[in-house]
Amino acid sequence: MSLSKHLQKLVHKRESKKQPNKKMPVSVSKLRRPRTSKKTETGNPEKTLKDPRTCCNNLFSIFSARSFLYRVPLTILFLFLIYLWSTSTTVISGNVVHICISSRKLTDLYCLTAGSQPALRAPVNNFTAPASEDVVTSKEEKNVFVLGKDGDKGFAENETFEGGKDSDKSTVGENLTINKNETFTGETSGERVSILNQDAKPIHEKNLDSVLDQDSLPKNEIDQDFIIDWDPETGEERYRYFKAKTEDEETGLKSTEEYIQIQRTWLSMGNNRKKPGSCEGKGVYVYDLPSKFNKDLLRECSDMVPWADFCNYFKNDAFGELMESMGKGWFRTHQYSLEPIFHSRILKHPCRVHNETQAKLFYVPFYGGMDVLRWHFKNVSSDVKDVLPIEIVKWLGSKKSWRKNSGKDHVFVLGKISWDFRRVDKYSWGSSLLEMQEMKNPTKLLIERNPWEVNDIAIPHPTYFHPKTDTDIAIWQNKILGKPRRSLISFAGAARPGNPESIRSILIDQCRSSPNQCRFLNCTDGGCDKSESVIELFRDSEFCLQPPGDSPTRKSIFDSLILGCIPVIFDPYSAYYQYTWHLPEDHRRYSVYINKEDVKLKRVNVIEKLMSKTLREREDMRSYIVHELLPGLVYGDSNAKFERFRDAFDITMDSLFKKIAKTV
């Protein structure tokens, strides 16, 4: 019996009980006369109009008669709609409702109203919502499943940075909830999964292959901005941030990755300096060089660069002037002050020895960066620039300690980028110190390394913070985690109009186009000259844009990290291929990577991409930065006494000892 016939019978039965002596009239259509019962009689038309139940019955009779002819097609259509609904997901994104179809044959959701297939890989074997409860709703439309930009996927917040409170969860039917605690990989706005019940666990994206059709998947995991590859020998994951365009580029990229992995094997994970006998076999000898190689260079501070007096930067053991407004341990430190800072600290190292025969590591306190800097803007010949580099190599060559291992157990700390010491004939910039054959074996610690030199090791730029005790670090950690962030994004820098490869102008335009989300501090007009201005900007921001400048690396990356601002990296050579001892291999834990080529070709809007990051993602990253990374990114006071933490200097020295033990 059809649904309409059954309902008609119930209505007739009910009417006959209430009005046994009245017959229900039936309206006659002008186009088609429905078949009527023999018992039906014509009643009073006025009563027909006055009685609403009678009108309803008239309309129902028409529907019943017409549906009789279409009973079979309507039944089929009704069943098809049920099937369609049970295999679809309604996705609410802003003011748009997307209907997305999934099936056991398709591992992707195909959104009929999206206009394209956004490649949303769904782990269908791991969680399934009831068919009738697939409509995603959210309180105040805060936390919804959206189609992200450029094919992103997943759960994101429809938030502007200035408004409203974040809801803790969005309900999806009775059993399915979207918890903000559940993160997927932390890289894109969509890498979040819903948990059907308490026992279910989120699946990391790189492991989704185990629940999907193996034949339909690529060999390597492809995220929007980088590729997760696997080492066939070790099974460990590797990150590819761009695809080599030529065979030479591929060779260079493989060398970079190989040297990065080698350097990570030298990283010392523990702190055993304070254990009894911890300096056994770890003596460090500091050469007492003629003053022309270090102290005399600092005395030229007033004439080092034409437009600035560097003398103030060399106060307080080269930390610079104290920033009283910031409190204890904060100084106006220059980015090129690493050499004297490291020298002051190593002179007080607990494993320092004064007898060369007791040493395993030899430190050469040559301020090569200061030597390069003083000639940068002076019209002198290359021979003049190479005077001290040639003399230091000659001086070392006279030492038995150098000749014993051909310099393999020696270390230089150079406070500029590697390329400033690798001048070739056609250029006039810098010195040729690191191009000398004698300099191949020693370890070179620099603020930016040559990725194709395994003995070039990058260590952090000096920041503004130089704590003296564990308490100083702990107080700052608590303070920065509790600091409200009034801006979503910030950028402190200047455009590079003469560099066609620079993306800075594009980022500045995007930032200025979204003043509610992004703040721009223009360094061209002196806005960055005052350290406090940069600190205030980063301390108030969730994300800090870090595009390459004159070279890939930036002091600003480390300034942002110690201020709790998540760095946005556009070039892997800015950080990921540099600081193997101080930054973890998994960049997603502390940064956001956006390929600079995508920015240059305007395939991505950086502001929109960062707006898609959830509050929980931001908080998790900041917590990791502040608790796990921050202590190891700062150079402590020259008299620092750390028991609980290791600062950047401690990590560097411990790892140097391990490197020498493995390679000499």
UniProtKB/Swiss-Prot annotation:
Glycosyltransferase as UniProt keyword: yes
GO molecular function: glycosyltransferase activity
Primary residence: Golgi
Membrane topology (Lumenal): 93-664
UniProt topology in membrane: Single-pass type II membrane protein
Disruption phenotype: Lacks acidic xyloglucan and has short root hairs.
Top EC class for this record: transferase
Residue segments, region Disordered: 1-49
Tissues in which the UniProt entry reports expression: Root hair specific. Expressed in roots and young leaves.
Keyword Membrane tagged: yes
Glycosylation sites: 126, 158, 175, 181, 355, 379, 522
Protein keywords: Glycoprotein, Glycosyltransferase, Golgi apparatus, Membrane, Signal-anchor, Transferase, Transmembrane, Transmembrane helix
GO cellular component, one term: Golgi membrane
Cytoplasmic-side positions: 1-71
Superkingdom, natural source: Eukaryota
Extent of Basic residues compositional bias: 1-21
UniProt subcellular location: Golgi apparatus membrane
Entry EC no(s): 2.4.1.-
Regions crossing the membrane: 72-92
Gene Ontology biological-process annotations: cell wall biogenesis; polysaccharide biosynthetic process; protein glycosylation; root hair elongation
Family from the record: Belongs to the glycosyltransferase 47 family.
Role of this protein: Xyloglucan-specific galacturonosyltransferase that forms the beta-D-galactosyluronic acid-(1->2)-alpha-D-xylosyl linkage. Required for root hair development probably by providing important acidic xyloglucans.
Name of the molecule in the record: Xyloglucan-specific galacturonosyltransferase 1
Gene behind this protein: GT16
